[in-house]
Swiss-Prot record:
It is found in: Secreted; Cell surface; Fimbrium. This is Probable minor pilin MMP0903. The lineage of its organism: Archaea, Methanobacteriati, Methanobacteriota, Methanomada group, Methanococci. Pfam families: Class_IIIsignal. InterPro entries: Class3_signal_pept_motif. It comes from Methanococcus maripaludis (strain DSM 14266 / JCM 13030 / NBRC 101832 / S2 / LL).
């Protein structure tokens, strides 16, 4: 009985360790996915802010040029 019980116990421990290892790998994958999604969302917000700033600067430049042309034609 001793030898069979020992062999079964080792298989059970290996199975438990494998289960813990798989769980750890899954948790790391979930955490990496979370960080990837957070990074993507932050990048999207930053891109939106940059685009809005660029459009605002472009509009200001166009308005200044339009006023300059309007002033030239009024003179």
């Amino acid at each position: 009985m001793g030898l069979k019980y020992l062999a079964f116990k080792n298989r059970g421990q290996i199975s438990l360790e494998l289960g813990v290892l798989v769980l750890a790998v899954a948790m790391v994958a979930v955490f990496a996915g979370y960080l990837y999604i957070q990074s993507t969302l932050e990048s999207a917000v930053k891109i939106n802010q940059t685009a809005n700033g660029t459009v605002g600067m472009y509009n200001s430049a166009v308005n200044r040029i339009t006023e300059s042309v309007g002033n030239l034609s009024n003179n």
